[in-house]
C-alpha cells in the first residue's frame, strides 16, 4: 500500500463518520446560505498580462506525512491574516485530520478572517466533500488525479463548477496531465512531491509544464523554499506557486510571503517567463 492509498483509506473512514452526523440536505442548505465563491482562477492568471507575474498561494499546514509536525498553529485565522497582509493571492487550508492535523473548522476560521479566495486542500473522493467545502466557505477545492478514476474526476470538476468554485486539479506525471486536460481542467497544479513515495523533485514542474496549454493556470506545488525558487518556476512557466512548509516553519510569515510575492512580481520574472 502506498502513502496515498493509506491516506485515502483514512479519508473514506472519516468521511463516512461525517456523513452519519450531517446529511447532504443539511450541507446543501448551509452552502446555499454562503456568499458566492470568489474567482480564484481570474486572480491567479489575470487577463491583463502586466498584472500577471507569479502569484503566491500560502498554506495553513500543521503536519505532513513526510516531515511530521511542522507547526502548532493555534490560531489559523491569525496566520491567514498575516499571509493576506503579505500579499498572498489565495490561502490554502489543509482540512485532512489524520496526517495533516487540519479540520473544516480551520477552513471556517480562515474564511471569516480574510477577503482573498480560500482553498480547501484535502483528498476529495466524493461530491459530499465539495458541498462541505462550499458550506464552510471555500472558493477553491483540490482534486488529485492520482486519487480518482477518470469518470469521478470529470464528475467532480463539473460539480465544483456548478457550485461556483474553482477546481485545482493536481498532477504528477504526463499521463495525469493528459487526464486532467481531458477532464477540462482549467487550473492545474503540478506537485513536485510524489504522493506515493513523498520524494520531491523540482524538475517535475519543468518537465510537465510544456504539456499544459497557455490558457490553463499552471501552479507549482511543493519545493519552494525562497524567492529563488519562484524565479526558477517562473522560468519554467508557472503562473503561481503553492507554499506551505517554508511559511509555517518561519518566524515571520508575513515577511516570508511578501518576499515571495515581490519575487513573483519582479520585472525580471516577467522577462524569463516563456
Swiss-Prot record:
The entry's keywords: Amino-acid biosynthesis, Aromatic amino acid biosynthesis, Decarboxylase, Lyase, Tryptophan biosynthesis
Entry annotated with the keyword Amino-acid biosynthesis: yes
GO MF terms held by the record: indole-3-glycerol-phosphate synthase activity; phosphoribosylanthranilate isomerase activity
A Pfam family of this chain: IGPS
InterPro entries: Aldolase_TIM, Indole-3-glycerol_P_synth, Indole-3-glycerol_P_synth_dom, Indole-3-GlycerolPSynthase_CS, RibuloseP-bd_barrel
Ranges in a coiled coil: none
Pathway the protein contributes to: Amino-acid biosynthesis; L-tryptophan biosynthesis; L-tryptophan from chorismate: step 4/5
Reaction catalysed by this enzyme: 1-(2-carboxyphenylamino)-1-deoxy-D-ribulose 5-phosphate + H(+) = (1S,2R)-1-C-(indol-3-yl)glycerol 3-phosphate + CO2 + H2O
A biological process from GO: L-tryptophan biosynthetic process
Lyase found in the keyword field: yes
The protein's name: Indole-3-glycerol phosphate synthase
Taxon lineage: Bacteria, Bacillati, Actinomycetota, Actinomycetes, Kineosporiales
Amino acid at each position: 500500500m502506498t502513502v496515498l492509498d493509506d491516506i485515502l483509506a483514512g479519508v473514506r473512514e472519516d468521511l463516512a463518520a461525517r456523513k452519519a452526523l450531517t446529511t447532504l440536505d443539511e450541507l446543501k442548505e448551509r452552502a446555499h446560505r454562503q456568499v458566492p465563491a470568489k474567482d480564484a482562477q481570474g486572480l491567479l492568471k489575470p487577463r491583463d498580462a502586466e498584472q500577471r507575474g507569479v502569484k503566491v498561494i500560502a498554506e495553513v499546514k500543521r503536519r505532513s506525512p513526510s516531515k511530521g509536525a511542522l507547526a502548532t498553529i493555534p490560531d489559523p485565522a491569525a496566520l491567514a491574516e498575516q499571509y493576506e497582509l503579505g500579499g498572498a493571492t489565495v490561502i490554502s487550508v489543509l482540512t485532512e485530520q489524520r496526517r495533516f492535523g487540519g479540520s473544516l473548522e480551520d477552513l471556517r476560521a480562515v474564511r471569516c478572517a480574510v477577503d482573498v479566495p480560500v482553498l480547501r486542500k484535502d483528498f476529495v473522493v466524493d461530491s459530499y466533500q465539495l458541498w462541505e467545502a462550499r458550506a464552510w466557505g471555500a472558493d477553491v477545492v483540490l482534486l488529485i488525479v492520482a486519487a480518482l478514476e477518470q469518470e469521478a474526476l470529470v464528475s467532480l470538476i463539473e460539480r465544483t463548477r456548478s457550485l461556483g468554485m474553482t477546481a485545482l486539479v493536481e498532477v504528477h506525471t504526463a499521463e495525469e496531465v493528459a487526464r486532467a486536460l481531458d477532464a477540462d481542467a482549467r487550473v492545474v497544479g503540478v506537485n513536485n512531491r510524489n504522493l506515493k513515495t513523498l520524494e520531491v523533485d523540482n524538475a517535475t514542474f519543468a518537465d510537465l509544464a510544456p504539456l499544459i496549454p497557455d490558457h490553463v493556470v499552471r501552479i507549482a506545488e511543493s519545493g519552494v523554499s525562497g524567492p529563488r525558487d519562484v524565479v526558477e518556476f517562473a522560468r519554467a512557466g508557472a503562473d503561481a506557486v503553492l507554499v506551505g512548509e517554508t511559511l509555517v516553519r518561519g518566524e515571520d510569515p508575513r515577511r516570508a510571503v511578501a518576499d515571495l510575492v515581490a519575487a513573483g512580481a519582479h520585472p525580471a520574472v516577467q522577462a524569463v517567463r516563456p
